[in-house]
Swiss-Prot record:
Belongs to the calmodulin family. The gene is PCM3. The modification N6,N6,N6-trimethyllysine is found at K91. It comes from Solanum tuberosum. The lineage of its organism: Eukaryota, Viridiplantae, Streptophyta, Embryophyta, Tracheophyta. This is Putative calmodulin-3. Keywords: Calcium, Metal-binding, Methylation, Repeat. Ca(2+) 2 binds at D32, D34, N36, T38, E43.
Amino acid sequence: GCITTKELGTVMRSLGQNPTEAELQDMINEVDADGNGTIDFPEFLNLMARKIKDTDFEEELKEAFRVFDKDRNGFISAAELPHVMTNLGEKLTDEEVDEIIREADVDCDGQINYDEFVKVMMAK
């Protein structure tokens, strides 16, 4: 059998996710190898493997952020960022660190909050 967007929505909600109709369609398009608009079981397994990987990665990000948010104020300083990245297995040049800070530090306060951090990391 095949899984439609409606059925995928039911499955995702049972897993504690709350995707929109558009997100469900994107998920199906992402793994719909034969382009028929539904996903079969192997395609479904591929999708679930990606989702689990994303979830684990987000947990890793939270953990890394917590480790380097020394005073628990919800920010990591620009100086701490290279240590965070190394901790996540990302070896970066000074230029790359500067670029991330420029991208992430929206309010130009020299610190990166958790949301800014996740946005940059998920874009990698």
